[in-house]
Amino acid sequence: MSRGLELLIAQTILQGFDAQYGRFLEVTSGAQQRFEQADWHAVQQAMKSRIHLYDHHVGLVVEQLRCITDGKSTDAAFLLRVKEHYTRLLPDYPRFEIAESFFNSVYCRLFDHRSLTPERLFIFSSQPERRFRTIPRPLAKDFFPDHGWEPLLTRILSDLPLRLPWQNKSRDIHYIIAHLTETFGAEALHRSHLQVANELFYRNKAAWLVGKLLTPAGTLPFLLPIHRTDEGELFVDTCLTTTAEASIVFGFARSYFMVYAPLPAALVEWLREILPGKTTAELYMAIGCQKHAKTESYREYLLYLANSDEQFIEAPGIRGMVMLVFTLPGFDRVFKIIKDRFAPQKEMSAAHVRACYQLVKEHDRVGRMADTQEFENFVLEKRRIAPALMTLLRQEAPEKIIDLGDQIVIRHLYIERRMVPLNIWLEQVEGQQLRDAIEEYGNAIRQLAAANIFPGDMLFKNFGVTRHGRVVFYDYDEICYMTEVNFRDIPQARYPEDELASEPWYSVSPGDVFPEEFRHWLCADPRIGPLFEEMHADLFRADYWRALQTRIREGHVEDVYAYRRKQRFCFRFAA
């Protein structure tokens, strides 16, 4: 093939990425209108649509390339020259880092995830030195309290692009100042100033003002979630100023933000200062660039692997009936493989499990479901695999493994944030920590249900505890929509011996769920049962679940808060 064809292919891939990111920005730019019009169902649809855009445009480019090459075979040297031409197109390209990931995706689609080497792919960036480049235009604006904090905040809120009236702007400003004064003191506040991102961050039913509070002691987050009333008036719900609070807002268990970012790398660098605990992958994930986040996540994994001599081991916790889970002892992620054969009580297929994981990817995760990254043909060095894990892999997933001598290839796996399994956490804590964990677990169930998600298997082992103490669901094989479940009361026993029988005295159909039965396994531990009955007894009533179903069917979309109820201004300051 000619050298001109190699350049044409490189240009076609980059043009395809341009088209994809253009549509990405187009969908994102509609977030303001959806918020102003309270079109919450459109918010959910836009979230799904934006996720699908990437794979759709990869497919379009692949079809173009097949037409261009007209079915001719391509040797290794040809492919290397295509990558070389593509690399030459990137030095002046503003979104070079995501363009590299797009190239990887096109290659993987064309060659069915085979021969994934650094020579053929951008396993590592071709331009790592550009990460801290000069930003062409300011991402944020500085505001100084020369005339006090009230006029400063008035100016910030008045400059917002939102076209709705405020419910009571002066009240909200008073609340913000009260929070800042209480937290930092008047003297420190007088010597501080704000830097506020030019673009709002939209998610669910809120528009987030994201900024930095620059104090004499250092830089802190400054986050204002702006909501609208049913009457279409704006109000600030709270003010968050700690890195822990910001980390939860930008957490891995939440849906991606809609924020207009023509230069995503620049935005990621700007955010890094107020989210010091977040990796590059997590920051890209938070702003919706999930495919590039996958690239960065893989790079973080390779870096960890290169700087440790740890072996892969089975992950701590109760062994799953559907998934085989392993990890590196010091790494903050786990690797999950769908087993070849499931336990008898798991009547489902591998395709069903994959569909459940995709549902979670596209759905509003409300801070209660862990995001995952999906990989194919994942290579592991045998010397890094503990013998016990290797035996387990060969027993539980032989069809998923290709033996290459010194390496194995895992045909398909998921990577997910590592957490402490809730059942293990509950064994280790007591007192207030135990109470907090049970409260968190019940709240997780409620928030998932309100978002039209029924976990299916609600055992403690299927939930994890994050480093911030939040309880997050991570076992998705029985997940379904709330509206697909038939919540029933257990019929009254006909005779006393009915309750002693091994089989139920009533009929049970597929999709039937009896919430009264939850009590048997959620309250079995005498330390936990009384706490659960105190805080979450309504979860054992079928009418509670049916009432939620009614609200969902009527089109109601619940409010989701990335902070505790007591932090809301309406509870904290209202008389």
From Swiss-Prot:
The keyword RNA-binding does not apply. The active site is at D371. One of its GO terms (molecular function) is phosphoprotein phosphatase activity. It is found in: Cytoplasm. ATP binds at A315, P316, G317, I318, R319, G320, M321, K336. InterPro entries: AceK_kinase, AceK_regulatory, Isocitrate_DH_AceK. Keywords: ATP-binding, Cytoplasm, Glyoxylate bypass, Hydrolase, Kinase, Nucleotide-binding, Protein phosphatase, Serine/threonine-protein kinase, Transferase, Tricarboxylic acid cycle. GO terms for biological process: glucose metabolic process; glyoxylate cycle; tricarboxylic acid cycle. Its EC number is 2.7.11.5, 3.1.3.-. It comes from the Bacteria. GO terms for cellular component: cytoplasm. It catalyses: L-seryl-[isocitrate dehydrogenase] + ATP = O-phospho-L-seryl-[isocitrate dehydrogenase] + ADP + H(+). Bifunctional enzyme which can phosphorylate or dephosphorylate isocitrate dehydrogenase (IDH) on a specific serine residue. This is a regulatory mechanism which enables bacteria to bypass the Krebs cycle via the glyoxylate shunt in response to the source of carbon. When bacteria are grown on glucose, IDH is fully active and unphosphorylated, but when grown on acetate or ethanol, the activity of IDH declines drastically concomitant with its phosphorylation. HAMAP family: AceK (MF_00747). Belongs to the AceK family. This is Isocitrate dehydrogenase kinase/phosphatase. It comes from Citrobacter koseri (strain ATCC BAA-895 / CDC 4225-83 / SGSC4696).
